[in-house]
């Protein structure tokens, strides 16, 4: 079978239609700079050759080529499913790749970059090369922060944390990261409705000397919002109450009277049947607290903490505005399977002796309603010795893991 695949892999043109060409190679050569590797640019190619192993063997194409023209045969169906159809060269996709490569270079500050292609056609196969000429990159001459809101202005002007510095090479990826940083800081300081899509960058590259001036500011559509809508974007919201719904399905039961409920210090807990976790365990693992400002960082930490608790399968956290500057937080929890039993049987062979081993395990992921994990494992083996003897071996282990959720 190996030799069949090797032969068919060599005959890569078997399934290439007449008048068409197999895209055999697609290489990228970057000139004028060592800061951009050709491998980084391959993601922008709109058409890539068939997958190669060891740099030359198109194994999946070879598997595809083993299929006969009769697609009703089982072998042909599976060969086409497992294999990889030949990549037929497309001049249209090559043109798109050229534009994408040029755009990628411009996004890295190479505004005058150019991309040319060359082809070598032989034996119905195309070897394509993209020649990328980088030219001199543009650098940031001046960086301006232009926000009327003082909170936003202070965050964006923080030169210690800002990703944009004068003199650095222009890079749109860094600009987008700076947008995310500024928006995240706003949301970590109570601005629930603020979003990175509200921020834009304006670039002026007419200064000459391969330099560009950058200004960070609000999108134009913000000015078309009403006064109330604009104030809402920059308003600091506080958490009024935190509601824990300890059963994902029960939280959707229309008849609230069928649920168990407890209230404590601004926290509300609802559940049906057995309580998933103790109240203190949930509070300890949820840094979102009544009376505090909304903080996106604490939201992320709450997801991380709660998802690590074994009794919890799924976490969803939503916020509900209840006044002009207050939010209610709803933490919806879905319980996982708390008890599990496992059994494993295997044959053994050691130094000519045959045997059999049986292993069993039990786990409880919420022993004291505080996300404690109790495990009990055992293993027994029986071995027939060549000298006529017998060997029996057994071992057991027990463990109890206390989560940070444990509250006393």
Q: Where in this protein do the model-derived segments appear?
A:
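C-terminal motif of bacterial Sec signal peptides marking the signal peptidase cleavage site
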Residues: 6-9
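Interaction-mediating elements
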Residues: 11-308
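Gram-negative/organellar outer-membrane beta-barrel architecture
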Residues: 154, 275-276, 292-408
């Amino acid at each position: 079978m190996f030799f069949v695949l090797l032969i068919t892999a060599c005959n890569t043109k078997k399934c290439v239609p007449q008048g068409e060409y197999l895209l055999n190679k697609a290489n990228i050569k970057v000139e004028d700079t060592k800061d951009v590797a050709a491998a980084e640019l391959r993601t922008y190619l709109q058409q890539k050759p068939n997958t190669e192993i060891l740099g030359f063997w198109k194994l999946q194409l070879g598997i595809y080529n083993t299929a006969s023209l009769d697609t009703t045969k089982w072998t042909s169906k599976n060969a086409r499913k497992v294999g990889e159809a030949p990549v037929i060269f497309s001049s249209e996709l090559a043109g798109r790749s050229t534009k994408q490569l040029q755009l990628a270079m411009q996004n890295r500050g190479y505004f005058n970059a150019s991309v040319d292609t060359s082809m070598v056609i032989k034996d119905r196969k195309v070897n394509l090369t993209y020649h990328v000429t980088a030219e001199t990159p543009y650098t940031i001459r001046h960086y301006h922060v232009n926000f009327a809101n003082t909170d936003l202005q202070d965050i964006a002007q923080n030169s210690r944390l800002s990703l944009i510095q004068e003199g650095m090479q222009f890079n749109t990826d860094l600009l987008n990261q700076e947008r995310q940083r500024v928006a995240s800081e706003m949301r970590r300081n109570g601005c629930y409705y603020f979003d990175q899509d509200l921020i834009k960058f304006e670039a002026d590259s007419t200064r000459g000397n391969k330099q560009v001036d950058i200004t960070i500011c609000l999108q134009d559509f913000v000015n078309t919002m009403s006064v109330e809508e604009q104030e809402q974007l920059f308003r600091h919201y506080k958490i009024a109450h935190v509601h824990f719904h300890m059963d994902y399905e029960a939280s959707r039961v229309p008849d609230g009277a069928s649920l168990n409920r407890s209230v404590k210090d601004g926290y509300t807990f609802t559940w049906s049947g057995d309580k998933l976790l103790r109240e203190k365990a949930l509070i300890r693992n949820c840094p979102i607290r009544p009376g505090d400002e909304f903080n996106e960082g604490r939201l992320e930490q709450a997801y991380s903490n709660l998802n690590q608790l074994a009794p919890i399968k799924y976490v969803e956290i939503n916020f509900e505005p209840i006044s002009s500057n207050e939010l209610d937080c709803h933490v919806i929890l879905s319980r996982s399977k708390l008890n599990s039993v496992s059994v494993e049987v295997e044959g053994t062979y050691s130094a000519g002796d045959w045997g059999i081993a049986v292993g069993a395990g039990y786990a409880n992921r919420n022993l004291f309603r505080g996300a404690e994990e109790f495990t009990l494992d055992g293993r027994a083996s029986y071995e027939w010795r060549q000298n006529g003897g017998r060997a029996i071996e057994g071992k057991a282990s027990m463990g109890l893991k206390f989560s940070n959720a444990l509250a006393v």
